[in-house]
Curated annotation (Swiss-Prot):
Phosphorylated. This is Protein phosphatase 1 regulatory subunit SDS22. One of its GO terms (cellular component) is nucleus. PANTHER family: PROTEIN PHOSPHATASE 1 REGULATORY SUBUNIT 7 (PTHR45973:SF23), PROTEIN PHOSPHATASE 1 REGULATORY SUBUNIT SDS22-RELATED (PTHR45973). Physically interacts with the dis2 and sds21 phosphatases. The keyword Nucleus applies. One of its GO terms (molecular function) is protein phosphatase activator activity. Residues 295-332 form the LRRCT domain. SMART domains: LRR_SD22, LRR_TYP, LRRcap. InterPro entries: Cilia_flagella_integrity, Leu-rich_rpt, Leu-rich_rpt_4, Leu-rich_rpt_typical-subtyp, LRR_dom_sf, U2A'_phosphoprotein32A_C. PROSITE patterns: LRR (PS51450). GO terms for biological process: cell division; positive regulation of mitotic metaphase/anaphase transition; positive regulation of mitotic sister chromatid separation; signaling. It comes from the Eukaryota. It comes from Schizosaccharomyces pombe (strain 972 / ATCC 24843).
């Protein structure tokens, strides 16, 4: 099973996979699973034009652990086997989260690409580790209390304006809230295990309220926002990957203290000074990759741009998409 943000899934020894866009709509008297043994532990019915979960007769699969019904026409969550640990309903027509009361062993739930407006009826799923709501119509982060085993939460592509109500997610490691309407970094105080924050394509204008993540945050993706300065980023002393592409940043000030930085993605900003690259970044001995393409310093010096960056930062292994050979002293 896969999702928008992760390649992880399960591969049980016994499973059924049907992926056929030409399969006709399933009616109550027309069950694709009639010939499937009762003891399978994984069923995948993808692009099968299924409209009703009830018509599948899933109750006879007493050992079913993983159910994937991606890219169908399901409007209602129902008849969910209580033995499930993974449920994938990505890309259906679901408008409401319901009928999960008895599915208490779920560790993975994907409801991405549906029509859900409100997060509800899931805080009893105490074992959830991965939860996905990509591309729905959700306006508010709420009703997640009790999900203290959750490590990965994906809320990208919704209508969320505020990061809130995450205090009980004390084991959260990855938070994805890209492509929303968020204007501010806030309410991270309780997320003491957060190592990755993706907040791309929002309305962020400054780095703020991040000191509480200084010891844990390793990856920060904040491209396509309204940032004009790195001020406030200096508190993230353990940051390893920083993506600020497609903002309006003019200077590299405040980066000199990020001693653990390995990758800096800063394409399509307003950076113009090679001297700043040397002054601010030459002390970052772990820095291996930089992206400066699309900045004035590249557009006004296209022929010598990469060589000048390499002279400023001889430790680099990659400039933009170009890998630097270990024996190379300059670009051709």
């Amino acid at each position: 099973m896969s999702n928008v943000s992760s390649e992880d899934g399960i591969a049980p020894e016994t499973q059924l996979i049907i992926d056929d866009p030409d399969v006709q709509q399933i009616d109550a008297d027309e069950d694709l699973l009639d010939d499937v043994p009762d003891d399978v532990d994984c069923v995948e019915l993808i692009q099968s034009r299924i409209q009703s979960m009830a018509s599948l007769g899933l109750e006879r699969f007493k050992n079913l652990q993983s159910l994937c019904l991606r890219q169908n026409q399901i409007k209602k969550i129902e008849s969910v086997p209580e033995t499930l640990t993974e449920l994938d309903l990505y890309d259906n027509l679901i408008v409401r989260i319901e009928n999960l009361d008895n599915v208490k062993n779920l560790t993975y739930l994907d409801l991405s690409f549906n029509n859900i407006k409100t997060i509800r009826n899931i805080n009893h799923l105490k074992g959830l580790e991965n939860l996905f709501f990509v591309q729905n119509r959700i306006r508010r982060i709420e009703n997640l209390e009790g999900l203290d085993r959750l490590t990965n939460l994906e809320l990208g592509g919704n209508k969320i304006r505020v990061i809130e109500n995450l205090d009980t997610l004390v084991n959260l490691e990855k938070l994805w809230v890209g492509k929303n309407k968020i204007t501010k970094f806030e309410n991270f105080e309780k997320l003491q295990k957060l190592s990755l924050l993706s907040i791309q394509s929002n309305r962020i204008t400054q780095f703020e309220n991040l000191a509480c993540l200084s010891h844990c945050l390793r990856e920060l993706y904040v491209s396509h926002n309204g940032l004009t300065s790195f001020s406030g980023i200096e508190v993230l002393e353990n940051l390893e990957i920083l993506d600020v592409s497609n903002n309006m940043i003019k200077h590299l000030s405040y980066l000199a203290g990020l001693k653990n930085l390995v990758e800096l993605w800063a394409s399509n900003n307003e950076l113009s000074s090679f001297q700043e690259i040397e002054d601010e970044l030459s002390g970052l001995k772990k820095l291996e990759t930089v992206y400066f393409e699309g900045n004035p310093l590249q557009k006004t010096n296209p022929a010598v741009y990469r060589n000048k960056v390499r002279l400023c930062l001889p430790q680099l292994r990659q400039i933009d998409a170009t890998i630097i050979p270990k024996t190379s002293k300059q670009f051709p």
